[in-house]
């Protein structure tokens, strides 16, 4: 689910957020982005 994406997904310094994005999409959200190295899902 969405909260597990925040814990599991690594957010790199230079905008690498593929892992976060994939996780959020699997959780049923539109996309995922990184904010201050934390994965955030966009419903």
Curated annotation (Swiss-Prot):
Disulfide bonds join 5-23, 11-34, 20-39, 24-41. Keywords: Disulfide bond, Ion channel impairing toxin, Knottin, Neurotoxin, Potassium channel impairing toxin, Secreted, Toxin, Voltage-gated potassium channel impairing toxin. It holds the Pfam family Toxin_17. One of its GO terms (cellular component) is extracellular region. Coiled coil: none annotated. Expressed by the venom gland. One of its GO terms (molecular function) is toxin activity. The keyword Disulfide bond applies. The presence of a 'disulfide through disulfide knot' structurally defines this protein as a knottin. This is Potassium channel toxin gamma-KTx 4.9. It comes from Centruroides sculpturatus.
